């Protein structure tokens, strides 16, 4: 039985190699040949029988993925100058860093640090030992699976930190989010305290008025599920959405708010929750001029070379050095403490 399987596998590989050789001459069929090689070569032996392995990275990604709407909209720009770029790079070697100059980060750890004002290094690492490599057979897929989830974790960390960062100021060299940047640099009127009351059009209009009075033109309003639900309820008796062609679809559309200063996109962000807010159990919303906000980076998220330690384990790391730039703080408002 095993001999027959080996013969079949050898035959399939020869056919794929022949097709690959032919495609090199005519410029066609490369993808088909590669698929054949992959299908017939990725096998492992279990009790003498052949079985093709199936990886669940796609399914796991679907289960764990959460949207990051702010990162999807904010411009990604290069570091603004040599000093800025140098600070980002040297953050790798600073104290209590995610990635030491002469070491490796902790396994499966997402840490945050920075070297100078507003600089932060986000990193995640995966360490796979020989035993896990043997158990997984094609262990590079196992490592990549971990890294994919690590990269998703980095994006989620950044999404949360963009809003709140180190809002209490207990660590001067930590990442500062919109909440504290507004409080520190935009003026008292740019933080509107709802004092536990629910969101209302008055709060939103007052926030827009502050931005317009200072020369801005707000473009986006970010809020969590609770506040979006309350805000939508305000219009339930005014704007009814009905799509006869879609059967029983009904409700109200809150995709945009037509304010006195023009249309503002309403964005639901799953990371704007009471547990993340400094005003928990209450929440906050942010009205921003997105054109004047940027995420500076030395380069896009990248991988460090694989490191093999003395314990015969391999470590691979993903790093992202970024800084949140709020170019005109006066054009951003936080309505905080919404009940």
Protein language model features and the residues they cover:
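Assembly/oligomerization interface modules of large self-assembling protein complexes
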Residues: 38-127, 147, 170
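Second-shell loop/turn segments in exported
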Residues: 133-140
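Stable alpha-helical elements in mature extracytoplasmic
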Residues: 143-146, 154
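Residue microenvironments linked to proteolytic maturation
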Residues: 150
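Structured segments of extracytoplasmic/periplasmic soluble domains
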Residues: 153-161, 210, 214, 234
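Short, glycine/acidic-rich hinge or "gate" loops at secondary-structure transitions
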Residues: 159-175
């Amino acid at each position: 039985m095993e001999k027959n399987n080996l013969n079949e596998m050898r035959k399939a590989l020869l056919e794929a190699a022949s097709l690959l050789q032919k495609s090199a001459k005519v410029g066609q069929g490369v993808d088909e040949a590669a698929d054949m090689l992959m299908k017939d070569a990725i096998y492992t032996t279990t009790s003498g029988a052949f079985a093709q392995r199936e990886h669940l990275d796609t399914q796991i990604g679907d289960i764990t993925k959460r949207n990051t709407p702010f990162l999807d909209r904010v411009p990604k720009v290069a570091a603004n100058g040599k000093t800025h770029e140098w600070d980002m790079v040297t953050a790798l070697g600073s104290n209590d860093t995610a990635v030491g100059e002469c070491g490796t980060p902790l396994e499966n750890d997402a840490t945050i640090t920075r070297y100078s004002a507003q600089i932060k290094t986000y990193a995640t690492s995966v360490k796979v030992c020989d035993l896990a490599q043997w158990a997984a057979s094609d262990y590079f897929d196992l490592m990549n699976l971990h890294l994919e989830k690590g990269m998703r974790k980095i994006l989620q960390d950044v999404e949360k930190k963009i809003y709140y960062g180190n809002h209490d100021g207990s660590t001067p060299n930590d990442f500062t989010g919109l909440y504290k940047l507004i409080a520190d640099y935009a003026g008292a009127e740019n933080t509107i305290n709802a004092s536990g009351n629910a969101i209302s059009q008055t709060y939103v209009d007052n926030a827009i008025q502050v931005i317009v009075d200072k020369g801005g033109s707000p473009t986006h309003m970010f809020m969590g599920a609770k506040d979006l639900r309350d805000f939508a309820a305000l219009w339930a008796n005014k704007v009814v959405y009905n799509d006869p062609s879609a059967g029983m679809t009904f409700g109200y559309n809150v995709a945009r708010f037509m304010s006195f200063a023009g249309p503002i996109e309403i964005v639901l962000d799953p990371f704007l929750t009471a547990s993340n807010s400094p005003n928990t159990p209450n929440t906050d919303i942010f009205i921003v001029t997105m054109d004047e906000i940027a995420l500076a980076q030395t380069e896009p998220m990248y991988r460090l070379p694989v490191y093999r330690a003395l314990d015969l384990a391999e470590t691979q790391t993903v790093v992202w050095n970024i800084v949140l730039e709020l170019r005109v703080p006066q054009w951003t408002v936080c309505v905080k403490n919404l009940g």
